[in-house]
Amino acid sequence: MISSFHRPTVARVNLQAIKENVASVQKHIPLGVKTYAVVKADAYGHGAVQVSKALLPQVDGYCVSNLDEALQLRQAGIDKEILILGVLLPNELELAVANAITVTIASLDWIALARLEKKECQGLKVHVKVDSGMGRIGLRSSKEVNLLIDSLKELGADVEGIFTHFATADEADDTKFNQQLQFFKKLIAGLEDKPRLVHASNSATSIWHSDTIFNAVRLGIVSYGLNPSGSNLSLPFPLQEALSLESSLVHVKMISAGDTVGYGATYTAKKSEYVGTVPIGYADGWTRNMQGFSVLVDGQFCEIIGRVSMDQLTIRLSKAYPLGTKVTLIGSNQQKNISTTDIANYRNTINYEVLCLLSDRIPRIY
């Protein structure tokens, strides 16, 4: 989708805030622990290349979801380690090796397929994924991991790391977390040749369970200034939300009692009132269920009335503001604030999703 620079809707990304957030977390983790910045999904909508470049002096490497995301960073000149967290099939190995990209291997079936396709792993750096209870990808026993490591070495791979992912590190009840932690520790203890890097700490684990950190962490949502738990747990130290979203009024009019607004005529005015149109809609990731939520105009909360359209939404105004008046959808406006978590709570979702849904049509300004 093309970025629409010729309309007033923009996302502003504060790279300094991201750097300071990472530094804040690093102050609370043990010395000598490696830091991976998680920049998958275009750095959670913030811009993977720009964020990665900003963090170059602070981090040891980067985590992405797939090979294309890794190649984007390499093509942008990022020369530190890049770990693909998802599964890369053997037919893409040559490209990974050629670009010095570290891959995740999560099953013995992968080895069988690599041998069937006569793939060698010479020069390939690998992290082995353990399923300690997340239930997605990974091996489930020391026996399987030992066999996988031996097989990878036979094929010429450098098995640098082993890792897992916690399902409930951002919840108050740590029962499941502790079960996973003990499972992972027991599996690691049963390895005949333990890889150099062992990591299990995502953002939530790094800030609320720092005593469980091994020798590397993966910092995702906290880097961007958001609470991994949404509103469930308090942050142990302050973070700065790095992304704000703003637009402008492009149309203002008065409607009368009985007039309707938007598709389905779901809003009917009870009295004469001013209505403003803002050029952002569900094609930008501002979803249809945001009807009834508010944005900020002139330091006042203004309700979204009528359904959110593909490209536009309408808000109730307290007066006839001039065209071009700033509208804040995420961020601060005259001492008032709307956070990404506020939006997530209204949508009954998580702050991660709100950010990741902001489409490429919205230009990012740094």
Swiss-Prot record:
Enzyme Commission numbers on file: 5.1.1.1
Keyword Isomerase tagged: yes
Binding positions (substrate): 136, 310
Protein's pathway: Amino-acid biosynthesis; D-alanine biosynthesis; D-alanine from L-alanine: step 1/1
Cofactor(s) recorded in Swiss-Prot or TrEMBL: pyridoxal 5'-phosphate
Biological processes annotated in GO: D-alanine biosynthetic process; peptidoglycan biosynthetic process
Entry keyword Isomerase: yes
CDD domains: PLPDE_III_AR
Any one GO MF annotation of this record: alanine racemase activity
N6-(pyridoxal phosphate)lysine PTM sites in chain numbering: 40
Alphabetical list of Gene3D superfamilies matching this protein: Alanine racemase, Lyase, Ornithine Decarboxylase, Chain A, domain 1
Record GO cellular component, one term: cytosol
Residues at the catalytic site: 40, 263
Swiss-Prot/TrEMBL keywords: Isomerase, Pyridoxal phosphate
Catalytic activity: L-alanine = D-alanine
The protein's role, per its UniProt record: Catalyzes the interconversion of L-alanine and D-alanine. May also act on other amino acids.
Protein family per UniProt: Belongs to the alanine racemase family.
Annotated protein name in UniProt: Alanine racemase
